[in-house]
């Protein structure tokens, strides 16, 4: 079952991206390196509740 998640920047704590994940394959919180428009650089984005 795929669920919608929000990705938050670890540096500025802005919620920049919406995504989906499969809970069966990824039960833990996912992390991606994505572009943060506020910092104007690529930063680590983590899943929020």
Swiss-Prot record:
Residue intervals passing through the bilayer: none
Entry-linked Gene3D superfamilies: Ribosomal protein L33
Pfam families per UniProt: Ribosomal_L33 (PF00471)
Annotated GO biological process: translation
InterPro entries on file: Ribosomal_bL33 (IPR001705), Ribosomal_bL33_CS (IPR018264), Ribosomal_bL33_sf (IPR038584), Ribosomal_zn-bd (IPR011332)
Keywords carried by this UniProt record: Ribonucleoprotein, Ribosomal protein
Domain of life: Bacteria
SUPFAM superfamilies: Zn-binding ribosomal proteins (SSF57829)
MF (Gene Ontology): structural constituent of ribosome
PROSITE patterns: RIBOSOMAL_L33
Annotated Gene Ontology cellular component terms: cytoplasm; ribonucleoprotein complex; ribosome
NCBIfam families: PRK00504.1, PRK00595.1, rpmG_bact
HAMAP family with a match to the protein in the record: Ribosomal_bL33
Family that this chain belongs to: Belongs to the bacterial ribosomal protein bL33 family.
Name this protein carries in UniProt: Large ribosomal subunit protein bL33B
């Amino acid at each position: 079952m795929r669920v919608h998640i929000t990705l938050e920047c670890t540096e500025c704590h802005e919620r920049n991206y919406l995504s989906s994940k499969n809970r069966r394959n990824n039960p833990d919180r996912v992390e991606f390196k994505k572009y943060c428009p506020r910092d104007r650089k690529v930063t680590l984005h983590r899943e929020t509740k």
